[in-house]
């Protein structure tokens, strides 16, 4: 009798990806975030689909349609808050996943890494457009401020902004197209995830030591399916705790006020997961310079493989690099804090120092210390 799992054209793909996949025996909990991101994406697509059934992308009715979802639709409130806070969980997992990649040198799988950067940009774009949809004050002004940044591009900037807006300001046309893009992008992300996994399975997973583990592999199922199931349980517990006890903890109170083009909120700021990039943007007095720094704060990940000067792949046995890595984490937390503060002393100078340190650490300090560690190996 033929084994369907191993011979059926579709089941074979699933089998090689999730069941019989040879996996390093020593991968830690830091390797759980890939599957957790998959879970987040599924949650976002399902909750988003149900929200889209009741949402209207018109400036006159968008805000009331979200209110209607929360008040009148069966379990609409929990679907809405699962979607809003699901985005926060998505970004927590994303940041930890990227951090893991940097710490353990996973970026040396350059194809997988580059698709990952594309995914990061796509998720950020999706989250930004999703934040505009409820059409509250912060939605409107956030959209105005961020899209306006494109006007810093020389020569074509102003035309580009008006083209994206579909007029001379953020209005009905902008909201409709943002809804269309917000709906389609998660499916593009899902397709990119498949490519991400395709490239990953070409090489096999990295492991905490950074040493080739071909001699010591175990099947993905049951070992890592059980481990992932525990991760799913922890993530859903955290998400449900957030949704059921303090759903507005990570949101902005200003977004409960309908959008008003004639009234600017005192502090325009994005969701918490964009604050580090927003702080880098604000720390440069020049508009074009700020926009470039904003893009580079994420795009810099693409040159990570080129900046890897160490003879060892992972930071597991490199204490100096480990110290710098955790300084980088602290720096990003500082930037996140600064991004939420008003533009005044002492926050301006702290933001500028933290932004400088971010690029200085990645571009100069970390590669230099890797070279020093190479020398120390010979002592």
From Swiss-Prot:
Taxonomically, the superkingdom here is Eukaryota
Q: What InterPro entries does the database record attribute to this sequence?
A: Cyt_b/b6_C (IPR005798), Cyt_b/b6_C_sf (IPR036150), Cyt_b/b6_N (IPR005797), Cytb/b6-like_sf (IPR027387), Cytochrome_b (IPR030689), Cytochrome_b_C_euk/bac (IPR048260), Cytochrome_b_N_euk/bac (IPR048259), Di-haem_cyt_TM (IPR016174)
Chain segments annotated as transmembrane: 33-53, 77-98, 113-133, 178-198, 226-246, 288-308, 320-340, 347-367
The UniProt annotation places a ubiquinone binding at 201
Q: Which residues bind heme b b562?
A: 83, 182
- Protein location: Mitochondrion inner membrane
Q: Which CDD domains match?
A: cytochrome_b_C, Cytochrome_b_N
The primary site where this protein sits is mitochondrion
Q: How does it sit in the membrane?
A: Multi-pass membrane protein
Q: Which residues bind heme b b566?
A: 97, 196
A Pfam match? Cytochrom_B_C
How many cofactors are bound and how?
Binds 2 heme b groups non-covalently.
GO molecular function of the protein, one example?
ubiquinol-cytochrome-c reductase activity
Alphabetical GO biological process terms? mitochondrial electron transport, ubiquinol to cytochrome c
Is tRNA-binding one of the keywords UniProt gives this record? Answer: no
Tell me which cofactor or cofactors this protein depends on: heme b
What keywords sit in the KW lines?
A: Electron transport, Heme, Iron, Membrane, Metal-binding, Mitochondrion, Mitochondrion inner membrane, Respiratory chain, Transmembrane, Transmembrane helix, Transport, Ubiquinone
**Mind telling me which PROSITE patterns this protein's record contains?**
CYTB_CTER, CYTB_NTER
Q: Name one GO cellular component term.
A: respiratory chain complex III
Query: What is the similarity comment for this entry?
Result: Belongs to the cytochrome b family.
Other notes: Heme 1 (or BL or b562) is low-potential and absorbs at about 562 nm, and heme 2 (or BH or b566) is high-potential and absorbs at about 566 nm.
Partners and quaternary state? Answer: The cytochrome bc1 complex contains 11 subunits: 3 respiratory subunits (MT-CYB, CYC1 and UQCRFS1), 2 core proteins (UQCRC1 and UQCRC2) and 6 low-molecular weight proteins (UQCRH/QCR6, UQCRB/QCR7, UQCRQ/QCR8, UQCR10/QCR9, UQCR11/QCR10 and a cleavage product of UQCRFS1). This cytochrome bc1 complex then forms a dimer.
Function in brief = Component of the ubiquinol-cytochrome c reductase complex (complex III or cytochrome b-c1 complex) that is part of the mitochondrial respiratory chain. The b-c1 complex mediates electron transfer from ubiquinol to cytochrome c. Contributes to the generation of a proton gradient across the mitochondrial membrane that is then used for ATP synthesis.
Protein's name according to its UniProt entry: Cytochrome b
Organism of this sequence: Ochotona hyperborea (Northern pika)
Q: List the lineage, top down.
A: Eukaryota, Metazoa, Chordata, Craniata, Vertebrata
**Gene coding for it:** MT-CYB
């Amino acid at each position: 009798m033929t084994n369907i799992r191993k011979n059926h054209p579709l089941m074979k793909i699933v089998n090689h990806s999730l069941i019989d996949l040879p996996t390093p025996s020593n991968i830690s909990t830091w390797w759980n975030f890939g599957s957790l991101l998959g879970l987040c994406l599924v949650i976002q697509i399902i909750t988003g689909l149900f929200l889209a059934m009741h949402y209207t992308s018109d400036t006159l009715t968008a805000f009331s349609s979200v209110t209607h979802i929360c008040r009148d639709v069966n379990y609409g409130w929990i679907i809405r808050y699962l979607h809003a806070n699901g985005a926060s969980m998505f970004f927590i997992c994303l940041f930890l996943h990227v951090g893991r990649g940097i710490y353990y040198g996973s970026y040396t799988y350059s194809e997988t890494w580059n698709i990952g950067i594309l995914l990061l940009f796509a998720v950020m774009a999706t989250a930004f457009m999703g934040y505009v949809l409820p059409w509250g004050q912060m939605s409107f002004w956030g959209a105005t401020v961020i899209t306006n940044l494109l006007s810093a591009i020389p020569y074509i900037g102003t035309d580009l902004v008006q083209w994206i807006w579909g007029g001379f300001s953020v209005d009905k046309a902008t909201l409709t197209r943002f809804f269309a893009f917000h709906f389609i992008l998660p499916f593009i992300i899902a397709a990119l995830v498949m490519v991400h996994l395709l490239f990953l399975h070409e090489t096999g997973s990295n492991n905490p030591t950074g040493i080739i583990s071909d001699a010591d592999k175990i099947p993905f199922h049951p070992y890592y399916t059980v481990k992932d199931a525990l991760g799913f349980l922890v993530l859903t517990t955290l998400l449900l705790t957030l949704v059921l006890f303090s759903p507005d903890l990570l949101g902005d109170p200003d977004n409960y006020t309908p959008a008003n083009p004639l009234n600017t909120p005192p502090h325009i700021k994005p969701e918490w997961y964009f604050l580090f990039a927003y702080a880098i943007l604000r720390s440069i007095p020049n508009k074009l310079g700020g926009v470039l720094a904003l893009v580079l704060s994420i795009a810099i990940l693409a040159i990570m493989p080129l900046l890897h000067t160490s003879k060892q792949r992972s930071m597991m046995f490199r204490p100096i690099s480990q110290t710098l890595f955790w300084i980088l984490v602290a720096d990003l937390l500082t930037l996140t804090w600064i991004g939420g503060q008003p533009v005044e002393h002492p926050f301006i100078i702290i933001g500028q120092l933290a932004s400088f340190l971010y690029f200085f650490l990645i571009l100069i300090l970390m590669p230099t210390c890797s070279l020093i560690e190479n020398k120390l190996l010979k002592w």
